[in-house]
Structures are given as C-alpha cells and as structure tokens.
C-alpha cells in the first residue's frame, strides 16, 4: 500500500465562503478504480462525499487527482472507503462527513460501503 502522507498531500483546500453557516456539499465521483487484492482484477465504483465544511472546502481537481492515485492499488472495498474518509478528515477537517463507495457488481453481488465522521456509534 502506498504511503498515506503522499496521498493526503494531493488534497488541496480553499476557505469556506460561509463558515458561520451549516450547509451540505455533495460530490459524486463515478469513475473510481482500484484493484482487487485477491484477484488482481480492476474494481470500479462511485465514491460519494457528503459533508458539512468547517473552515475549508476541498478543491475538486485535487480530489479527482487524489482518487486517481488508487487506480493501481490492491485494496479491499472496506479498506479503501475507510482510508478515503480518514484522509479527507485529516485534510479538510469537516464538521461532519459521510463517504459512500458504491461498487459495480462482480459475480452477481454488488456492495455499498458507508462510513461517517464523527462516528455515529
């Protein structure tokens, strides 16, 4: 697995234009690709970010470049979804965020992984 810091360094932010207001931003990234660590076959999915920014918002080109770094990574659905959330929280520091990965069916099964910050436990 590649170095977490080098992935996080790809993400850029800009100042929240309305930091005193709670508002929701939703980004859909329908061309996500990673590699199944068991089979070596590509996995395709959509990553959806739904977040309430605090001081900053994520810059979209950097988000696209960040997600493209996973293209050749052998990583399970659950692991990549949690890693994306952890990296997003570390850089953007949102008030709250949900990351959902929606995977293209494989072998007659499809998977959706949903992770949130802060934890809703």
Curated annotation (Swiss-Prot):
One of its GO terms (cellular component) is cytosol. Substrate binds at residues 58-60, 77-78. It comes from the Bacteria. It is found in: Cytoplasm. The keyword Cytoplasm applies. The lineage of its organism: Bacteria, Pseudomonadati, Planctomycetota, Planctomycetia, Pirellulales. This is NADPH-dependent 7-cyano-7-deazaguanine reductase. The keyword DNA damage does not apply. GO terms for molecular function: preQ1 synthase activity. Keywords: Cytoplasm, NADP, Oxidoreductase, Queuosine biosynthesis. Catalyzes the NADPH-dependent reduction of 7-cyano-7-deazaguanine (preQ0) to 7-aminomethyl-7-deazaguanine (preQ1). It catalyses: 7-aminomethyl-7-carbaguanine + 2 NADP(+) = 7-cyano-7-deazaguanine + 2 NADPH + 3 H(+). Belongs to the GTP cyclohydrolase I family. QueF type 1 subfamily. The active site is at 36 (thioimide intermediate), 43 (proton donor). Its EC number is 1.7.1.13. PANTHER family: NADPH-DEPENDENT 7-CYANO-7-DEAZAGUANINE REDUCTASE.
